[in-house]
């Protein structure tokens, strides 16, 4: 999910330059502390970090497949480590995930032709992200039941720029912050429900925050 914030600065009609307000200084300082959006490689893994610029979020790559993220009063961000391109592999991860409000820990990725954004949600905060979509069915995998949903995003940010696209969701009923995800099971279940993926782009174990605060430390393998 993506939200955007706007900033309106009032100017005084005087001949001398007005001193910046305490609010504008604080907002500029907050922006300077936050990690900018970026992609690349770190520790032998692909990483992706995206933020809409709202609030304070610090994403830090560690050794190997590890990373940390701390966020305060954010708009929306998503970041993590994995692979580019993704595949129908089994992904192991471990760590801590402590959202205060709305946040997700998931296997997260994109495909093209068709353009699909997908989530295999392992844990979430106080909001189940799948419930905003349409429930399609369930899947038994990796020791739990996953509820499967679809949703449509219109004129939203994507790997192809602003676009309209479909989201696929598998949301684990028993939350966890470590384990293995057999992605093939999800891809097969989606296909059986008529949910067709395209050609894999990147695939990461991601932390996402939306209008919330929190912290996480994750290692991917």
UniProtKB/Swiss-Prot annotation:
GO biological process: xylan catabolic process
Signal sequence coordinates: 1-18
Entry keyword Transit peptide: no
Pathway: Glycan degradation; xylan degradation
Keywords tagged on the record: Carbohydrate metabolism, Glycosidase, Hydrolase, Polysaccharide degradation, Secreted, Signal, Xylan degradation
Gene3D superfamilies: 2.60.120.180
Induction remark: Expressed in the presence of D-xylose under conditions of acidic ambient pH, probably under the regulation of the pacC transcription factor. Repressed in presence of glucose through the action of the creA transcription repressor.
GO cellular component: extracellular region
Boundaries of every GH11 domain copy: 33-221
An annotated Gene Ontology molecular function: endo-1,4-beta-xylanase activity
Places the protein is found: Secreted
Enzyme active site: 117 (nucleophile), 208 (proton donor)
Role noted for this protein: Endo-1,4-beta-xylanase involved in the hydrolysis of xylan, a major structural heterogeneous polysaccharide found in plant biomass representing the second most abundant polysaccharide in the biosphere, after cellulose.
PANTHER family attached to this UniProt entry: ENDO-1,4-BETA-XYLANASE A-RELATED (PTHR46828:SF2)
Family: Belongs to the glycosyl hydrolase 11 (cellulase G) family.
Protein name: Endo-1,4-beta-xylanase B
């Amino acid at each position: 999910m993506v939200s955007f914030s706007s900033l309106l600065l009032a100017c005084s009609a005087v001949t001398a330059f007005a001193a910046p307000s305490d609010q504008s200084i604080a907002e500029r300082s907050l922006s300077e502390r936050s990690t900018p959006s970026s992609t690349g490689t770190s520790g032998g893994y692909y990483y992706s970090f995206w933020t809409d610029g709202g609030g304070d979020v610090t994403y830090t790559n560690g050794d190997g497949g590890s990373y940390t993220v701390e966020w305060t009063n954010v708009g929306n961000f998503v970041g993590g480590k994995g692979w580019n391109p993704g595949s129908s592999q089994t992904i192991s991860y471990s760590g801590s995930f402590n959202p205060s409000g709305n946040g997700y820990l998931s296997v997260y990725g994109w495909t093209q032709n068709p353009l699909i954004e997908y989530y295999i949600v392992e844990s979430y905060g106080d909001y189940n992200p799948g419930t905003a979509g349409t429930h399609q069915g369930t899947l038994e995998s990796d020791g739990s039941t996953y509820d499967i949903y679809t949703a449509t995003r219109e004129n939203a940010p994507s790997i192809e720029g602003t676009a309209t696209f479909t989201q696929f969701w598998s949301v684990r009923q028993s939350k966890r912050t470590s384990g293995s995800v057999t992605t093939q099971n999800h891809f097969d279940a989606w296909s059986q429900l008529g949910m067709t993926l395209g050609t894999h782009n990147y695939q990461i174990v991601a932390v996402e925050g939306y209008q919330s605060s929190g912290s996480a430390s994750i290692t991917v393998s």
